[in-house]
Amino acid sequence: MDSLTGSQIIGQQLSDHGDEKYRATSAFSGEPMAPFFRNASEGEVDRAVCLARDASDFWATASPDVKSKFLRELAQRVNASREKLLNRASLETGYPEPRLTMELDRSLFQLGVFANLVEEGSWVDAIIDQRKANQAGPPQPDLRRMLRPVGPVGVFGASNFPFAISVIGNDVVSAWAAGCPVVVKGHPGHPGTCELLGRCVQDVIRSKNLPEGIFSLVQGTQNRVGEALVQHPSIRAIGFTGSLRGGKSLWALTQKRPEPIPFFAELGSLNPTLAFPAIFRRNTSDFTKNLLASLTIGNGQMCTRPGFVFYVKCRETEQWTQELLTAASLAPQQPLLNTSVASQFAEATEQYRVQLDARQIFPLQTKDEPKSEFDASPPSLHLYQVTAAEVLRCGAKWTEAFGPVCILVGCKDLEEMKAITNTLPGGLTLSLHADPAEQTLAAQWLSDWTAKFGRIVWNDFPTGVPIGNATQHGGPYPASFDGQGTSIGTRAIERFARPTCYQNFPETLLPPELQSDNPRHIWRQVDGRLTQDKLPH
């Protein structure tokens, strides 16, 4: 792979029409790094989307074999560039190599998962109601329904996952698997990593002689680049992972279009952890160790980080708090992703103090000292403590802080714990730590939790999100705009497909998945029964 160019990747072309230049910043030194990148021009965004539109019919009807081979070859191509990718991503994010290696391996695995999904083919949810003339009531026509790709998709990469939620990340791969060309808006925090990944995609598309519009990458620090993408009339859906503020701004633009489009956004979540009393009446060392690991992985820059721990105050919880503080002093530290994240982290933690009347218990506050414009010292884990009564008195103004921080909320009894958790906004996860004897109590609260959270965790922590068939990564607002879908796991493909029904169609005009002979041998629901059988003509 050649060295970085700072160019946009528009189909098979490298483009440099933008005027404003910028550079990535080292997470370790704060120094700008080569090369200069350009903010994509409106013309470059338009060209990328038009190429995607032109490739749409081909990719929508391409065989499962073509799509799966593309995904598998891309995994091989990215893996061959592993060393260069890891080196650049570490400089741009500050993540240590083991953390990045794990993320890259996960992303390569995800490509294989979706290749398998496409090959098997049943994800299209084919449903057939055969013609019924001899039944009570009017005759029923032949109805055949399946999921079809929506068309070109715009995807916004995230700051905290340079591989897994980026150019080859979950939104992009699930859109490709659904049959949608993709235009990626790279995150300005790691533009070099984005370009290196984009060149891998470009190489595979060229080597397999596929339409160039299946993929383009536009980059920039200016809001206008993303705004041009979401407002382009040929974009049919958006995938976004980022802040609530940024997501709301882009969502508003999609709804102001002459034809509003779906905006699938993963925004933010408090991820409360509820610790029932029995937890503290036994050895809490594993609970403490695993909580800290969940809080500090990626330096707390995870959308599933457990931001609040609720418990009933007693002598045992006082002892546990001291145990937690001792363990926190040994927690690993690393830089935050960039100065913007650091600034927002400082602002959010200050809001905890002001809006929730929370008291910082780790690290102990010291007199402010002058700092340089770039402070390369990693922020330590921040722990705050507050009572439920104080939070309720302050109006329960819940705010997410993106970084290594957790609020310990002490409740006078279980009734107060239930009262305060009922004020929580929608979220990605809720975790419950309890003894088997407390299952009856948990059952009484469960319906409240399922109404607000996408994934409910029993005696575990929420940071790990497996790429599975049952995975749910999404939840009611403000975790997502549409809590009915998931952005991780095989079901993520359904966001970029919509149902189409064919009534009384001749066999020759039906997609293979709906033809009576079932040439792709997929599972289908026929007259209410799952089967892979052929149907009589």
Which positions does each model-derived feature cover?
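Short, well-ordered beta-strand elements within core beta-sheets of diverse protein domains
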Residues: 34-39, 55-61, 135-136, 154-155, ...
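Structural signal for hydrophobic packing residues in well-ordered secondary-structure cores
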Residues: 56, 60, 75-82, 86-89, ...
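Short loop-to-beta-strand entry elements in the cores of soluble alpha/beta enzymes
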Residues: 70, 178-193, 214, 259-277, ...
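NAD(P)-dependent aldehyde/semialdehyde dehydrogenase
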Residues: 5, 289, 311-428
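N-terminal Rossmann-like NAD(P)+-binding subdomain of aldehyde/semialdehyde dehydrogenases
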Residues: 1-141
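C-terminal core of ALDH-fold dehydrogenases
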Residues: 373-377, 414-510
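Rossmann-like NAD(P) dinucleotide-binding subdomain of oxidoreductase/dehydrogenase enzymes
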Residues: 122-292, 310, 314-317, 535-536
